[in-house]
Amino acid sequence: MINDKLPKIWHGGDYNPEQWDSQEIWDEDVRMFKLAGIDVATLNVFSWALNQPNEDTYNFEWLDDKINRLYENGIYTCLATSTAAHPAWMAKKYPDVLRVDFYGRKRKFGSRHNSCPNSPTYREYSEKIADKLAERYKDHPAVLIWHVSNEYGGYCYCDNCQDAFRVWLSDKYGTLEKLNKAWNTGFWGHTFYEWDEIVAPNMLSEEREDNVSDFQGISLDYRRFQSDSLLDCYKLEYNAIRKHTPNIPITTNLMGTYPMLDYFKWAKEMDVVSWDNYPAIDTPFSYTAMTHDLMRGLKSGQPFMLMEQTPSQQNWQPYNSLKRPGVMRLWSYQAIGRGADTILYFQLRRSVGACEKYHGAVIEHVGHEHTRVFNEVAQIGKEFNQLGDTLLDARVNARVAIVFDWENRWATELSSGPSVSLDYVNEVHKYYDALYKLNVQVDMVGVEEDLSQYDVVIAPVLYMVKEGYAAKVESFVENGGTFITTFFSGIVNETDIVTLGGYPGELRKVLGIWAEEIDALHPDETNEIVVNGSRGSLSGSYSCNLLFDLIHTEGAQAVAEYGSDFYQGMPVLTVNEFGKGKAWYVASSPDAEFLVDFLQTVCEEAGVEPLLSVPEGVETTERVKDGQTYLFVLNHNNKVESIDLKDSQYQELLSTQQLSGTVELEAKGVFILAKV
């Protein structure tokens, strides 16, 4: 478990008592926290200016008081380092802490996420305050976990970053000769002869808006560099804390599929993954499920923390709808069912001013417990106390994996062609969504993950094939695995240089095909996938769009063909028998109906069964602990649904009822079923 001081699902959230100067409010907060079953408060996230009013003065007395007061009332602390927004005095005295944006404009003090990651000043003072906090609270029994900074993100293009980029490149490539080759700088006369000739790629040099770059290799490396730079800032604080508190876990809150940081690399430096879940009004339930699975996958299935979710509404979406009754509870159990061991909110008391005053909270502006949201939070708190440690450390066992890679995403998005509408994350989600509808458990994995534990591995739009990965795929398939990849795969290496010899490059052998050309049409234009006869659930015709690989089989079998255009009759879906396994290639972006039928067929052939057969709009997921399975059934619909449990006998953990046969699950309802 994360910390055995609190052996249950943690329940709490961000608390900012420094925003009020009222003992009466602070006392009321504690009273209501206890009513709601709140047992963890995240403190000190944005308090740097309060903690350090000037260069030489530190003030932690206010924090002592709040940590002690909460602990005396049975509430533990998730202690943040306060470095997510630097103080105004620092920006005034040391302007090197201020970022330069993509357009070359130097920021002034304001907002947050505003510190240059390569500022010597920022690094010095952030490390110093983390050190002082850790030294002060190293023996405090209230501290469960350290929370470094907050939601790292954004890039900087200042001179400090540009200089550091050159050093980073020198460390990576060693010589300019190797760098020039890796970036293909013979194109457009870009050969570099001195390291200081290299400039940061932004609107003033190689890039334009919307990920348009003239030199993808340069832009790709700058993204790697900025991700590493922010990670270095995190590691400075991590190490400062670790020397004082070797046994208290350390984390920082990630943001799901956030594009700018390579979270698989970050997760290696985190004791536990934590993330903030803020779906938009139109976010599919399956997308949120996929993101939970991705966060779990960052550390190879280790349970994660849900660090933030709103109890009711957000404040920064275009349309900030209320969570309908039951939805917060439902989504909380969705997170737990997919690997979360904590449910924490932003925020515990609603701010009275600035941009988050309309962001939802456990305690609303009215200031009492007689609200719908508070009562729902209190219900969850009661249930978590009832569950105790039953679900802690339970794992999710999946036989199907989907590959997700941030560097591949960057390269795909930076690609100059063939279509501005190609969206890597959307293509990945389409495959996940089909498996979600089929109630098949999925792991989201990085390219370093061991594939041998899976029966089926899907790598949509694997544009960049990193060194050794093709051999890894070949070994997986040779030993009986089923591999699926798609159009626009196997095109380039890690520096965005095309692999010569025909697409899909290093994957050509295992797939048994050659892609001669790639057609790109407007997203509204479609072609047909016409199945040759039938195979499993696949039959008839389906729609496809976006990109269309014109492929020739080289040992693979054509399972389906294009139905129109000049490439009518050419293969669009192939399967290649390779060793003991199979490798599938989907040459276009298919509709949802095709993906459900296709992946159902693939899973049946691989012997992968669904968790349960349930109505549309009902989600299933399963965790396992000490040989005991816990099946979560989540009704996202606005009506009661009938769930057929067959002849199996279950104990439902929330109601403690014994269930079997056909049972009714209320709208927005949850079952946690332990097989008897």
Swiss-Prot record:
Enzyme Commission code: 3.2.1.23
Catalyzed reactions per annotation: Hydrolysis of terminal non-reducing beta-D-galactose residues in beta-D-galactosides
Pfam families, per the entry: Glyco_hydro_42, Glyco_hydro_42C, Glyco_hydro_42M
Positions annotated to bind Zn(2+): C116, C156, C158, C161
GO terms under cellular component: beta-galactosidase complex
Signal peptide coordinates: none
Superkingdom, taxonomy of origin: Bacteria
Keywords assigned by UniProt, alphabetized: Glycosidase, Hydrolase, Metal-binding, Zinc
Biological process terms in GO annotation: galactose metabolic process
Field pH dependence: Optimum pH is 6.8. Exhibits above 80% of its maximal activity in the pH range 6.0-8.0 using ONPG as substrate at 20 degrees Celsius.
Thermal dependence: Optimum temperature is 20 degrees Celsius. Lowering or raising the temperature from 20 degrees Celsius results in reduction of activity when ONPG is used as substrate. Rather stable at or below 25 degrees Celsius, but loses 58% of activity after 30 minutes at 40 degrees Celsius. Loses all activity in only 10 minutes at 45 degrees Celsius. Exhibits 27% of maximal activity even at 0 degrees Celsius, but enzyme activity decreases with a further increase in temperature until it is undetectable above 50 degrees Celsius.
Enzyme class: hydrolase
Catalytic residues, chain numbering: E151, E308
CDD domains: A4_beta-galactosidase_middle_domain
Xref: InterPro entries: Beta_galactosidase_C, Beta_galactosidase_Trimer, Class_I_gatase-like, Glyco_hydro_42, Glyco_hydro_42_N, Glyco_hydro_b, Glycoside_hydrolase_SF
Binding site for substrate: R112, N150, W316, E356, K357, Y358, H359
Activity regulation: No activity lost during treatment with 100 mM EDTA after 2 hours, and the addition of 1 mM MgCl(2), 1 mM CaCl(2) or 1 mM MnCl(2) has no effect. However, the enzyme activity is inhibited by Zn(2+), Cu(2+), Ni(2+) and Co(2+) to different extents. Addition of Na(+) or K(+) slightly stimulates the enzyme activity at low concentrations and the optimal concentration is 250 mM. A further increase of their concentration of ions above the optimum value results in a decrease in enzyme activity. The enzyme is still active even in the presence of Na(+) or K(+) at a concentration up to 5 M.
UniProt biotechnology annotation: Could conceivably be developed to fulfill the practical requirements to enable its use for lactose removal in milk and dairy products at low temperature or a reporter enzyme for psychrophilic genetic systems.
Described purpose of this protein according to its UniProt entry: Hydrolyzes lactose, o-nitrophenyl-beta-D-galactopyranoside (ONPG), p-nitrophenyl-beta-D-galactopyranoside (PNPG), 5-bromo-4-chloro-3-indolyl-beta-D-galactopyranoside (X-gal), o-nitrophenyl-beta-D-fucopyranoside, p-nitrophenyl-beta-D-mannoside, o-nitrophenyl-beta-D-glucoside, p-nitrophenyl-beta-D-xyloside, p-nitrophenyl-beta-D-cellobioside, p-nitrophenyl-beta-D-arabinoside, p-nitrophenyl-beta-D-lactoside, p-nitrophenyl-beta-D-galacturonide, p-nitrophenyl-beta-D-glucuronide and p-nitrophenyl-alpha-D-galactoside with highest level of activity with ONPG as substrate, intermediate level of activity with PNPG and lower levels of activity with all other chromogenic nitrophenyl analogs.
Subunit architecture: Homodimer.
Entry-linked PANTHER family: BETA-GALACTOSIDASE GANA
Name listed for the protein in its UniProt record: Beta-galactosidase BgaP
Designated gene of the protein: bgaP
